[in-house]
Amino acid sequence: YHAISVTVWGRLYRRALFEKELRHYPLRLGEDSLLNIQIGCQQPRVRFIDYVGYGYVQRGGSANRSPLDIGYCVKFSEAVRAELVRHRDILGDRLEFYLLLNKMRWYLVYLRKSHNPWAGGTEFARGINAEAGRYRAELGGFFSRCDRLLLRMDRRRWMRPGVLAVSTLMRWGKSLKRRLAH
């Protein structure tokens, strides 16, 4: 069982939210994030369920096992941008910050995959690093120091092995903490 609080199945929704103007994007990963962004922009209060246990079954050909390429990160970012711009009146001057949070989250997932090639030189990655500099203090509340270190290291191709080493150590540390907690 896994504890999931940020995904669609970790919340209770009013049916009326689904009868409003929800858009459905043809994306193979992250559809739940887009749904939550749309609902979050419509609903002033959201209540989280502290723990959600579910039997996780993964089937062959599952999107979770699909390779995540940099093009997908860009495509997903564009879909999120479309939703946040659509609700600009609610977000105000926080729009760019929320876009950066989304881009960083997906790019960090991409970075941690050892089979993914270096993408630190792409316009997408360079843009994230440039924007992160403007919000350095605020990002500390959302991303660990190690996450931010991965982004800084990824600016240089020759540091790709270091990025993978740090991300592996982070994964092992997280796994060890989880095992010791039980």
Language-model features and meaning:
Residues 113-182:
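Membrane-interface aromatic/basic loop that binds lipid-linked glycans or pyrophosphate carriers
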Residues 8, 100-102, 153, 157:
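Short alpha-helical segments used as structural interaction elements across diverse proteins
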Residues 52-59, 65-91, 106-135:
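Catalytic core of nucleotide-sugar-dependent glycosyltransferases
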Residues 1, 103-106:
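Short glycine/proline-rich turn/loop motifs
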Residues 1-69:
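Conserved nucleotide-sugar donor-binding catalytic segment
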Residues 75, 94-102:
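Residues within HEAT/ARM-like alpha-solenoid scaffolds
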